[in-house]
Amino acid sequence: FENKVPEKQKLFQEDNGIPVVLKGGVADA
């Protein structure tokens, strides 16, 4: 997860512009 998360977080930030903490947390959960 640690390796895949950073890559996805960057994509989410660029696309949605939403904080990776909120978006990533919900998406991963």
Swiss-Prot record:
Any one Gene Ontology biological process term? mitochondrial electron transport, cytochrome c to oxygen
What SUPFAM superfamilies does the entry give?
Answer: Mitochondrial cytochrome c oxidase subunit VIIa
According to UniProt, the name of this protein is Cytochrome c oxidase subunit 7A2, mitochondrial
Q: Supply one GO CC term from the record.
A: mitochondrial inner membrane
| Molecular function terms, GO-annotated | oxidoreductase activity
- Name the InterPro entries for this protein: COX7a (IPR039297), Cyt_c_oxidase_su7a_sf (IPR036539), Cytc_oxidase_su7a_met (IPR003177)
Q: Which pathway, metabolic or otherwise, does it act in?
A: Energy metabolism; oxidative phosphorylation
Q: Tell me what organism the protein belongs to.
A: Canis lupus familiaris
Xref: Pfam families = COX7a
Give the protein family: Belongs to the cytochrome c oxidase VIIa family.
